[in-house]
């Protein structure tokens, strides 16, 4: 018997049944689920200081437990002195057990450490049940050692679901314990 994360077990045993009864699905296969979580960090100053980009990759890897990849600029923006193909950020795509472990850590350990946190804005959804929000400081995660970071920077979290609309997506994430302000 292999290890099953707590949130995955809770989803399988409780959340699916609650969603089926709440939205009157004909089958449990219609219930929305989380497909992936993308955690990204833009490093605008990477143009001048390559060390910042390496530190962002290291921090994302520590936070998520999975190796981060560097992202490149899609097109040149002269105002920001960015050339096409230049490395300007880092991202991690989490699926499976790692995704559930990160979500548990985010909801129960990291978000409660945010100063004056009142919940994630209910308008953080894109119309298709996917939720995107920003975190101002990476130091809310316990894996980051405050003394060893180059600088305090924020990160973006996108939770991609199979929900058909925002109402279903918000209900799914709320059942996982995600705090919403409205």
UniProtKB/Swiss-Prot annotation:
GO MF annotation list:
rRNA binding; structural constituent of ribosome; tRNA binding
Work out whether the entry's keyword set contains ATP-binding.
Answer: no
UniProt keyword annotations, A-Z: Ribonucleoprotein, Ribosomal protein, RNA-binding, rRNA-binding, tRNA-binding
Q: Which GO terms describe its biological process?
A: translation
Asked whether the keyword Ribonucleoprotein is assigned, the reply is yes
- InterPro entries under this entry? Ribosomal_uL5, Ribosomal_uL5_bac-type, Ribosomal_uL5_C, Ribosomal_uL5_CS, Ribosomal_uL5_dom_sf, Ribosomal_uL5_N
- Judging by the UniProt lineage, the source's domain of life is Bacteria
Q: Name one Pfam family in it.
A: Ribosomal_L5
List the GO cellular component terms.
ribonucleoprotein complex; ribosome
Tell me which family the UniProt entry assigns to this protein.
Belongs to the universal ribosomal protein uL5 family.
The record's annotation in NCBIfam families points to:
PRK00010.1
Q: What does this protein do?
A: This is one of the proteins that bind and probably mediate the attachment of the 5S RNA into the large ribosomal subunit, where it forms part of the central protuberance. In the 70S ribosome it contacts protein S13 of the 30S subunit (bridge B1b), connecting the 2 subunits; this bridge is implicated in subunit movement. Contacts the P site tRNA; the 5S rRNA and some of its associated proteins might help stabilize positioning of ribosome-bound tRNAs.
Question: Oligomeric state and partners?
Answer: Part of the 50S ribosomal subunit; part of the 5S rRNA/L5/L18/L25 subcomplex. Contacts the 5S rRNA and the P site tRNA. Forms a bridge to the 30S subunit in the 70S ribosome.
The name of this protein is Large ribosomal subunit protein uL5
């Amino acid at each position: 018997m292999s290890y099953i994360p707590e949130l995955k077990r809770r989803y399988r045993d409780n959340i699916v049944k609650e969603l089926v009864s709440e939205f009157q699905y004909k089958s449990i296969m219609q219930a929305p689920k989380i497909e992936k979580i993308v955690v990204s960090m833009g490093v605008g100053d990477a143009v001048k200081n390559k060390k910042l980009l390496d530190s962002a990759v290291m921090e994302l890897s520590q936070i998520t437990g999975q190796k981060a990849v560097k992202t490149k600029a899609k097109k040149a923006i002269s105002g920001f002195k960015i050339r096409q193909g230049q490395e300007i950020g880092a991202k991690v795509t989490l699926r499976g057990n790692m995704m559930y472990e990160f979500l548990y850590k985010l909801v129960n350990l990291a978000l409660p450490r945010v100063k004056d946190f009142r919940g994630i804005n209910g308008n953080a959804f894109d119309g298709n049940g996917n939720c995107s929000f920003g975190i101002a400081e990476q130091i809310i995660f316990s894996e980051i050692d405050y003394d060893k970071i180059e600088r305090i920077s924020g990160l973006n979290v996108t939770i991609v679901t199979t929900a058909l609309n925002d109402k279903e997506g918000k209900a799914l994430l709320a059942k996982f314990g995600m705090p919403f302000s409205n």
